[in-house]
């Protein structure tokens, strides 16, 4: 079993995580994906994971992180573009989401194929 695409590298220090915060944000109910184009297409993609203390105790936070890491390893890693950095910020719903659904949501966010937004005419319901 040889994979055609190599697994993404890791973001390891605070300055790398902070640099990605300046990039694009792709929001969702289960997690947020922050993406930064490093403008170096020949380099491998890199990924980092963040789970804040507000999301639960250490056991729950580690479980969220492990689920996201495994989803990236199994399927979402191949969707990552070379020369890009990704930070995945977990929300509590990561624990309750079925794993296949989590994988598909992660691929969707990484590829940037989110649901289309409402048009300006239908946006306000109060008028």
From Swiss-Prot:
<keyword id="KW-0378">Hydrolase</keyword>
<dbReference type="Pfam" id="PF00825">
    <property type="entry name" value="Ribonuclease_P"/>
</dbReference>
<dbReference type="InterPro" id="IPR000100">
    <property type="entry name" value="RNase_P"/>
</dbReference>
<comment type="function">
    <text>RNaseP catalyzes the removal of the 5'-leader sequence from pre-tRNA to produce the mature 5'-terminus. It can also cleave other RNA substrates such as 4.5S RNA. The protein component plays an auxiliary but essential role in vivo by binding to the 5'-leader sequence and broadening the substrate specificity of the ribozyme.</text>
</comment>
<keyword id="KW-0255">Endonuclease</keyword>
<keyword id="KW-0540">Nuclease</keyword>
<dbReference type="GO" id="GO:0004526">
    <property type="term" value="F:ribonuclease P activity"/>
</dbReference>
<keyword id="KW-0694">RNA-binding</keyword>
<comment type="subunit">
    <text>Consists of a catalytic RNA component (M1 or rnpB) and a protein subunit.</text>
</comment>
<dbReference type="InterPro" id="IPR020568">
    <property type="entry name" value="Ribosomal_Su5_D2-typ_SF"/>
</dbReference>
<dbReference type="GO" id="GO:0001682">
    <property type="term" value="P:tRNA 5'-leader removal"/>
</dbReference>
<comment type="similarity">
    <text>Belongs to the RnpA family.</text>
</comment>
<dbReference type="GO" id="GO:0030677">
    <property type="term" value="C:ribonuclease P complex"/>
</dbReference>
<keyword id="KW-0819">tRNA processing</keyword>
<protein>
    <recommendedName>
        <fullName>Ribonuclease P protein component</fullName>
        <ecNumber>3.1.26.5</ecNumber>
    </recommendedName>
</protein>
<dbReference type="GO" id="GO:0042781">
    <property type="term" value="F:3'-tRNA processing endoribonuclease activity"/>
</dbReference>
<dbReference type="InterPro" id="IPR014721">
    <property type="entry name" value="Ribsml_uS5_D2-typ_fold_subgr"/>
</dbReference>
<dbReference type="GO" id="GO:0000049">
    <property type="term" value="F:tRNA binding"/>
</dbReference>
